[in-house]
Amino acid sequence: MFTDQGPTLCELAVQALSSVERGYDLLAPKFDQTPFRTPDVVLDAVGRALAGLGLYGTGLDLCCGTGAGLRVLREAGVGRAVGVDFSGGMLDVARRGEPTADCVRADALALPFGEVFDLVVSFGAFGHFLPREWPRLFSEVCQVLRPGGQFAFPLPAPMGPGSLGYWAMLGFDGAMRVRNAVWRPPFVMYYRPFRLGDVRRELDRAGFDVALHALSELGERPDGSPRCGLVVATRR
């Protein structure tokens, strides 16, 4: 699952017992060699889809980590790309990989921008926000988008109990809940609650019109539905 250049189990254990910020600072040099990074096939599919959906002058990669989404912004035709993350270590890696982008250290729940972006993307970050934080998060995104601007992110179809991935995700969430019950500081990383119906409702309340685009090149489920969709929320 990990490459030879990835973190050791000992390094992962230290990271998992840290705060979210400190954990990612520690993981940053080897993050791109872990399965936690969004796969290139997903990034490429999103970039191609966005390139056909609009013209974007400025773009923001929300919770950019090591900057994989900054490349997506370029592929979507964004003229000026900005990445924001609260891990200084992750931003250092992002700056080296995308030297033409502006990388800003900030909290996603208190974005230091006005209405300056045409497009906001995010990859693999929503598990770090509890459901009660979604309204504030989506409101922050809405406030940094120009009217008509888009907030886009991939969302895999939910896995059924007959799949290995379903039980792996259930086990991971359970392990994180036990960890946070007995250890401080907490490390928030729960991905199962982020479901389309709830997310669509909160985006609508925050001021977005929501559409779901199939990322067909990522394959289909046995019932013919797409394995992954692209949520595109347009600011009203």
Named regions from a protein language model:
Residues 1-54, 152-176:
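Conserved class I S-adenosyl-L-methionine
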Residues 221-236:
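Core SAM-dependent methyltransferase catalytic element
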Residues 121:
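A conserved beta-strand element that flanks and buttresses the S-adenosyl-L-methionine
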Residues 60, 66-110:
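Class I SAM-dependent methyltransferase SAM/SAH-binding core
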Residues 208-219:
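Conserved S-adenosyl-L-methionine
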Residues 182-197:
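Acceptor-substrate binding/catalytic loop of class I
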Residues 135-147:
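A short glycine-rich, Lys/Arg-flanked "PGG" loop and its adjoining helix->strand segment in the class I
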